Amino acid sequence: MNRDSFYPAIACFPLLLMLAGCAPMHETRQALSQQTPAAQVDTALPTALKNGWPDSQWWLEYHDNQLTSLINNALQSAPDMQVAEQRIQLAEAQAKAVATQDGPQLDFSADMERQKMSAEGLMGPFALNDPAAGTTGPWYTNGTFGLTAGWHLDIWGKNRAEITARLGTVKARAAEREQTRQLLAGSVARLYWEWQTQAALNTVLQQIEKEQNTIIATDRQLYQNGITSSVEGVETDINASKTRQQLNDVAGKMKIIEARLNALTNHQTKSLKLKTVALPKVASQLPDELGYSLLARRADLQAAHWYVESSLSTIDAAKAAFYPDINLMAFLQQDALHLSDLFRHSAQQMGVTAGLTLPIFDSGRLNANLDIAKAESNLSIASYNKAVVEAVNDVARAASQVQTLAEKNQHQAQIERDALRVVGLAQARFNAGLIAGSRVSEARIPALRERANGLLLQGQWLDASIQLTGALGGGYKR
């Protein structure tokens, strides 16, 4: 070995010795891999239904100012949104707290102490009052003030990894806030259209009750004239009672829905007054392909992804803990036994300190922390994989339900048209004087009941379409 290569080798020897003396890092189980959905999710929907992804404010497509106002109130004042916002602020504060450890620190300190020296202790000579020797004991009033600086050198990237982990948590919390936003908007929209469905059903039931009352009045008149017996009107009376019971049930459901909307929108001070509007027409939409796009458009998947990224950075920080810590410290102070001497130039003291902490034997603490970090990371990855599978299943299930209900609505529309034709024929026969008016009412009641069934199916389709919008991410985009 020549002299030029000998000295660099000698210079690197302390570093090699330092690294060799670190606590050994044992091997752990292999990390899990993240799952991605298939390139295309087959939802078996007709091409005509595949019109694209939902918009971030998908509820505006209903063109209903009342619904928009309810959702805006919920997003602004709902307790769930407040909790999500505070979780983000907490994560940001924690990230800032970790980031402050990565830079230099500078402190100013000052103290004053009045003390009596012991003549029998280590500082015994200072207990004497001998001005010639520089002692004026036994009482002293000493003071110190000055600056102290420190810097923890993040050579192995431990602090940087911890900062990255915290920032990943911040991004995950932000995605969770968006998920809360979409869930809240979806819940308000579903309740709102359920209320509108019940309100429309209430109108139809009132029409049925009106027709039943017409039949009952006619039957009573015929009975009073001795044309029919009392038994013939019993069935109509029973049906009218059932209709009244259905009206009471609908009114109760509407009150429950209003109470739930009040809770979601934090609208507790006064009662919620909703106006009835027509239900939207049945129409479905779904993008042609999902695949990787679903990962970027589902806020819950993004939150799970960022938790995984955060956990991987936590592993890096746990690995960096096996290497030495290096700290630099410096101080510039004034220190004197007597306050009168505190501001003299001779009372000045200064120094620089370089410290090194080398983990050699820790009873397995560092390896245990590393095992915990890896286990938490594997748990985050497993949770992410589970969320991916559930997200794809949610889309497939919701899309299938939307398609099924759309087909049912089409069949129901045909049934309603046929029922109206029967009513038209009865009305024509009445106009020709061939049947009584009560027979027209008898023809209208089945048509109205089919209309009630159609409203329920339309409301079910609305609910399913909102669930499909949520399954597609509700307009969220990374």
From Swiss-Prot:
Covalent lipidation (N-palmitoyl cysteine), chain numbering: C22
Residues with lipid group (S-diacylglycerol cysteine): C22
Name this protein carries in UniProt: Multidrug resistance outer membrane protein MdtQ
Family to which the UniProt record says this protein belongs: Belongs to the outer membrane factor (OMF) (TC 1.B.17) family.
NCBIfam families cross-referenced by the UniProt entry: outer_NodT (TIGR01845), PRK11459.1 (NF008524)
Domain of life: Bacteria
Record-annotated membrane-spanning stretches: none
Cleavable signal peptide: 1-21
Major localization listed first in the record, in broad terms: membrane
Bilayer disposition of the protein: Lipid-anchor
UniProt keyword terms in alphabetical order: Antibiotic resistance, Cell outer membrane, Lipoprotein, Membrane, Palmitate, Signal, Transmembrane, Transmembrane beta strand
A matching Pfam family: OEP
The keyword Methyltransferase is annotated on this UniProt entry: no
GO cellular component: cell outer membrane
Subcellular location: Cell outer membrane
Family matches, as InterPro entries: OMF, OMP_efflux, RND_efflux_OM_lipoprot_NodT
Record-level Gene Ontology MF annotations: efflux transmembrane transporter activity
Biological role stated in the UniProt entry: Could be involved in resistance to puromycin, acriflavine and tetraphenylarsonium chloride.
GO BP terms: response to antibiotic
